[in-house]
Curated annotation (Swiss-Prot):
The lineage of its organism: Eukaryota, Amoebozoa, Evosea, Eumycetozoa, Dictyostelia. Pathway: Amino-acid biosynthesis; L-proline biosynthesis; L-proline from L-glutamate 5-semialdehyde: step 1/1. Residues 279-551 are annotated as: Disordered. HAMAP family: P5C_reductase (MF_01925). Residues 282-298, 306-342, 383-415, 424-441, 448-475, 487-496, 503-520 have a biased composition (Low complexity). GO terms for biological process: L-proline biosynthetic process. It comes from the Eukaryota. Belongs to the pyrroline-5-carboxylate reductase family. This is Pyrroline-5-carboxylate reductase 1. Keywords: Amino-acid biosynthesis, NADP, Oxidoreductase, Proline biosynthesis. Gene3D superfamilies: NAD(P)-binding Rossmann-like Domain (3.40.50.720), ProC C-terminal domain-like (1.10.3730.10).
């Protein structure tokens, strides 16, 4: 960046900073490209950029590019601004401060450098090169010497006078008078404008238009100021020239004085001066009070700590040593805890990767396990179907043979009944034929026993009263050797129930749903055949009982 030897940086381009920048260009002592303006919000000073001014938000860049720095911020923003330019300020810079209430020593101590600082108090008329600027370089009790620092201060004062004389008029005062000058010089613009406005309102009341009244009042005030500045007379001298005996001027002045015109102006200026003195110092006082409170609090804590140590030392020595060891262990633990806390992020990152890997392995194992289970279930269903198909074929063959056996048993029963009526003893049949034609129920076995009994016992049985039908229908107990076919039917029925339970439990697998449905329909058909065969058996049994009752 190019450092302009005669360049000016205006930090804080508000109303006053904007007026100073335009006044510098209007004085023809500076060009617009030699002035750098800074502000937080650049939208308000964007038109100045089109006029050739350098605009930025960085105070550091502005100070590094210019030798003369004019600080134009409000007192509340001064500390932050000084912090931002502390590193870029050198002893070759000239700092001109227009901040109300901030002394030279406050600014120098904050910058921590022996930089020449000039306090200035202009007004907004500087825009038209009509400002009255008050300057100060040192306090009243300080005197100029031939030291390098004093020479640098005097040189800085001459540069400031040269700048502000081009913008109006300047006067050198002591630093103690800068605060009252703020009320009279800077605030005076507002006071005199209010007086001009009051005069314009009076002109409207007596018949003038507002614009005409303001123009007449403002030009009259300018003429009055010119008379005082050019002639260097007292204001009362000019007043006496205007007033005449029993005239209108003296009548109006007297009415203003009765209303308190002069006293109101005086009171307003004094009040403004008092307030200007406390703008920055009040903030500093608040900071000092806070610092004092902190110091007092620290001292109080230090005293309490010392008292506690004295009490501990007065105790037994071993207790004191134990407390020291505990404090040392606690400090070591805290250091280790802090180190672990710093590395906690890395450990957590590794744990997350390990968890992701474990979850992936679990998912893969579950998929393998499910596929193996499905394969086993499918194989088990095939085995069940094959086992179930074999007994159904055997039962179908038995059912075809069963009607022939029933016909033979009916014929034998009819023959026995006819012989019993005629009084003939039944003929004994050979054992081979009985073994071939085995009855399917226990009632046929009882008939064979009756045939083997002698005729006397048969007559006694006929003489006995007939038992109820329910008792007659109960099957007689036979030995296990005489009914081998019943032993074969019981395991088949148990196998069917086991297969049915296994089918119902295995039906939950979703992959073999269609196969299981076929198996289920076949199983119900088989159950239907068993039901029909059992019903045929009971019908034959009832028929035999009826024939016995008739006999």
């Amino acid at each position: 960046m190019k450092l302009y030897d005669n360049g000016v940086a205006v930090l804080g381009c508000g109303n006053l900073g904007n007026a100073i920048a335009k006044g510098l260009v209007a004085s023809k002592q500076f060009k617009s490209n030699q002035i750098v303006l800074t502000k937080r919000n650049l939208s308000t000073i964007e038109p100045l950029k089109r006029e050739g001014y350098h605009v930025t938000t960085s105070n550091h860049d502005a100070v590094s590019r210019c030798k003369i720095v004019i600080v134009c911020v409000v007192p509340a923003q001064l500390d932050d601004l000084l912090d931002s330019i502390k590193q870029s300020v050198t002893e070759n810079h000239i700092i001109i401060s227009v901040v109300s209430g901030a002394s030279i020593e406050d600014i120098r101590s904050h910058l921590e450098k022996d930089v020449p600082i000039v306090r200035a108090m202009p007004n907004t008329a500087i825009q038209h090169c009509q400002s009255m600027t008050c300057l100060a370089i040192r306090s009243s009790h300080q005197k100029s010497t031939n030291s390098p620092s004093d020479k640098a201060k005097d040189n800085a004062l001459e540069v400031a006078k040269k700048i502000f004389n081009c913008l109006g008029m300047s006067i050198v005062l002591s630093e103690e008078q800068i605060v009252p000058a703020t009320a009279l010089c800077a605030c005076g613009i507002a006071f005199f404008c209010r007086a001009i406005r009051a005069a314009a309102q009076g002109g409207c009341e007596i018949g003038f238009h507002a614009e005409d009244a303001i123009r007449i009042a403002a030009q009259t005030a300018k003429g009055a100021a010119t008379l005082l500045l050019e002639n260097n007379f007292h204001p009362e001298y000019e007043i006496d020239k205007v007033t005449t005996p029993q005239g209108c001027t003296i009548a109006g002045l007297n009415q203003m004085e009765h209303a308190g015109f002069s006293s109101a102006m005086i009171k307003g200026i004094v009040t403004s001066s008092d307030k200007a003195a406390s703008l920055y110092t009040q903030k500093q006082q608040n900071k000092k009070q806070q610092q004092l409170k902190q110091q007092q609090h620290q001292q109080h804590q230090h005293q309490q700590h010392q008292q506690h140590q004295q009490q501990v030392q007065q105790q037994e020595p071993h207790q004191y040593q134990q407390q020291q060891q505990q404090s040392h262990q606690q400090s070591q633990y805290n250091q280790g805890h802090n180190y672990g806390h710093q590395n906690q992020h890395h450990h957590n990152h590794d744990d997350q990767h390990q968890n992701y890997y474990n979850q992936d392995q679990k998912r893969r194992n579950n998929r393998k396990h499910r596929s193996n289970e499905n394969y086993d279930n499918h194989h088990h269903h095939n085995q069940q179907y094959q086992q179930h198909q074999q007994p159904t074929q055997q039962e179908s063959q038995e059912q075809t043979q069963q009607p022939e056996q029933t016909q033979s048993t009916n014929q034998s029963n009819q023959r026995r009944n006819s012989e019993s009526r005629n009084g003939k003893s039944p003929q004994k049949q050979p054992q081979k034929q009985s073994q071939v034609q085995q009855p399917s129920s226990t009632t046929e076995n009882t008939d064979q026993q009756q045939q083997q009994q002698p005729p006397q016992e048969q007559q006694q049985q006929q003489e006995q009263p007939q038992q109820p039908q329910e008792q007659q229908q109960q099957p007689n107990v036979v030995d296990e050797a005489e009914r081998p076919k019943e032993q074969q039917q019981q395991p088949q029925q148990q196998q069917q129930t086991i297969d049915k339970k296994g089918y119902n439990n295995n039906r939950r697998g979703g992959r073999h749903y269609s196969y299981n449905n076929n198996y289920n329909s076949h199983h119900h058909r088989h159950n239907g055949i068993n039901k029909n065969s059992s019903s045929m058996y009971h019908d034959e049994k009832r028929h035999e009982v009826k024939t016995e009752q008739i006999n």
